Amino acid sequence: MAAESSLRVATPTICNLNGSQRRPTTLSPLRFMGFSPRPSHSLTSSSLSHFFGSTRINSNSSSISRQHAPRRNFSVFAMSGDDAKRSVPLKDYRNIGIMAHIDAGKTTTTERILYYTGRNYKIGEVHEGTATMDWMEQEQERGITITSAATTTFWNKHRINIIDTPGHVDFTLEVERALRVLDGAICLFDSVAGVEPQSETVWRQADKYGVPRICFVNKMDRLGANFYRTRDMIVTNLGAKPLVIQLPIGSEDNFKGVIDLVRNKAIVWSGEELGAKFDIVDVPEDLQEQAQEYRAQMIETIVEFDDQAMENYLEGIEPDEETIKKLIRKGTISASFVPVMCGSAFKNKGVQPLLDAVVDYLPSPLDLPAMKGSDPENPEETIERVASDDEPFAGLAFKIMSDPFVGSLTFVRVYAGKLSAGSYVLNANKGKKERIGRLLEMHANSREDVKVALAGDIIALAGLKDTITGETLCDPDNPIVLERMDFPDPVIKVAIEPKTKADVDKMATGLIKLAQEDPSFHFSRDEEINQTVIEGMGELHLEIIVDRLKREFKVEANVGAPQVNYRESISKTAEVKYVHKKQSGGQGQFADITVRFEPMDPGSGYEFKSEIKGGAVPKEYIPGVMKGLEECMSNGVLAGFPVVDVRAVLTDGSYHDVDSSVLAFQLAARGAFREGIRKAGPRMLEPIMKVEVVTPEEHLGDVIGDLNSRRGQINSFGDKPGGLKVVDALVPLAEMFQYVSTLRGMTKGRASYTMQLAMFDVVPQHIQNQLATKEQEVAA
């Protein structure tokens, strides 16, 4: 808590780095003057046509800034001479993200954090379109977060780097790349809805990267709020072990504050000064028994992490407050449990204790294992980088953002070492050196120049030309390649064309920049039918892309009907012998190969394996076989969709001393693919979505009937407060286009739904035949 000795606590001050408190001061307009915009580099017409004619462009990150006034009131580094002097010890760094289902209150919570820490001078509201972190026009209009936004603030002498992430499933990539570079996370839950589908998705993403987290049950002021039901859902839906460290005092309109079980005190907000003041009082009498019960459960759980504390507890001696915090921190960082807190960000209650928990329980970079990578020259060799300024520099580029005044900005998490403006770094993935133009600390879409970045920092770099999302930047003399991120494949596509021929080049420029920012967005150009196709994670994702083309690149476009990204696979093993022979005077072409095609588990992708023995196919020709097969995997034999979950095994072959070549074996592999896949029982796969519909009970029958008509499979039913029913179903994506309009119509606008990709499954034969026929007609 910010001031433990005082019963009356005021918090709209920020901690200065020397330990004193200061009030925020209003910035003078003169502070914003003298900013000289730098022109961003544009692509030439020739380079545009080169890119536009390529089969696919896909790279990395976020959005284009509009506000350009740099914030000067937060200096990140104190400079001494020509070197950086760390003003905040690394142990006091917290790199955190805020993640949750859509509308759980992520951005609202972040806005309160920025206000109470003194970073902002007023509270921005999502519903008013004034939230600092939702700076894009589309975000302000729709009231949702589309791109992750980064900022830095301070609390109790700790530096907190925050990334606010989207909750909509279409923008799950933003959550993925944020969690990849964060040390801890706050997972928000709506106290009425509990654990929702996208909450489960982001929880699994955090599990994947081993991110310690704390839970905040938000919206305790809402009708139907139930802290204890949400706590139970954390167990049943997420398989996690919640450690309750706060209890609510009241709920709905009577929600007044929380019981802090660590200190065994109640924290009550009066509603004055936007929640900046609160009282620390004794636990109310009617809640003392319940508080003692949950406090005992908390202590019994945490003393398992310390033998002395356990021994004392068995002898009737409770650990003191400092020991309790230390043990909660230990269990949180080891992911043995997740602390659970509660509050109402919108009503300004519970946010300051949440900030205390970030400082007390979430890890600093020093609390986590050393970052592991590989040697670029020898990928089998593991290299470690410890979080220290004295280590060689190593950082991961996790986001690209276009800025109209600075150009392309590359967001980097610095894991080790120092980075200064004007220095050179090595892109270890590409083996290219890059020069750092400027180092910028970001606050949403405003920026401030800094001279040096140190271990633990999240910084934006200007001037990089060849680095994309997921690539490693490092000291040229000490190269290391860090683990890359996984990017989801698009599941939906639409055809798009500019309304006027004059906009062709402008649209190409826009698509290239948007694809560089967002690795989950792809586009391709089919010159034969003169059509451009854009691909993304859902209808909303592509709708935002088209809207950004219009607003940011001034391109009006005609958009076709959505189409599904199907896949092709095989159902059985087949072996084929293929001989490629061509003789037309001079040196001919000869390659003889035998390839076995085997089905693999769903989600396995493609795998090549060589079982050649005795030099039947020389080693120098095997790469030709690999390349030929890989080229074919993007164009299946049924309807031209990508082929997945197939293992190709080169088992035998022969060659000619004169006529054989890498090209000959590459062409032979193509022929073997066409024949072999047809023999292996080819089949088409379609994306199946997990759909959750929340509807009033009187419309339940209509909803179920409609889902059944869409080839849906009903999995389960559930209840929600207010007489609402929950339908959980699996439905093919092809049947879900424009579903929102249908659902609103049959329920008079009272139902809602969410959906996310669950799996790929076999397409029914009659639909497969229709798709194959359609592809043949297009080809003809």
From Swiss-Prot:
One of its GO terms (molecular function) is GTP binding. It comes from the Eukaryota. Pathway: Protein biosynthesis; polypeptide chain elongation. This is Elongation factor G-2, chloroplastic. NCBIfam families: EF-G, PRK12740.1-3, PRK12740.1-5, small_GTP. Keywords: Chloroplast, Elongation factor, GTP-binding, Nucleotide-binding, Plastid, Protein biosynthesis, Transit peptide. Residues 1-79 form a transit peptide. It comes from Glycine max. The keyword Heme does not apply. It is found in: Plastid, Chloroplast. GO terms for cellular component: chloroplast. The gene is fusA2. Belongs to the TRAFAC class translation factor GTPase superfamily. Classic translation factor GTPase family. EF-G/EF-2 subfamily. InterPro entries: EF_G_plantC (IPR030848), EFG_II (IPR041095), EFG_III (IPR009022), EFG_III/V (IPR035647), EFG_IV (IPR047872), EFG_V (IPR035649), EFG_V-like (IPR000640), EFTu-like_2 (IPR004161). Transmembrane segments: none annotated. GO terms for biological process: ribosome disassembly. Residues 91-366 form the tr-type G domain. Pfam families: EFG_C, EFG_III, EFG_IV, GTP_EFTU, GTP_EFTU_D2. GTP binds at residues 100-107, 164-168, 218-221. SMART domains: EFG_C, EFG_IV. Chloroplast-localized elongation factor EF-G involved in protein synthesis in plastids. Catalyzes the GTP-dependent ribosomal translocation step during translation elongation. During this step, the ribosome changes from the pre-translocational (PRE) to the post-translocational (POST) state as the newly formed A-site-bound peptidyl-tRNA and P-site-bound deacylated tRNA move to the P and E sites, respectively. Catalyzes the coordinated movement of the two tRNA molecules, the mRNA and conformational changes in the ribosome.
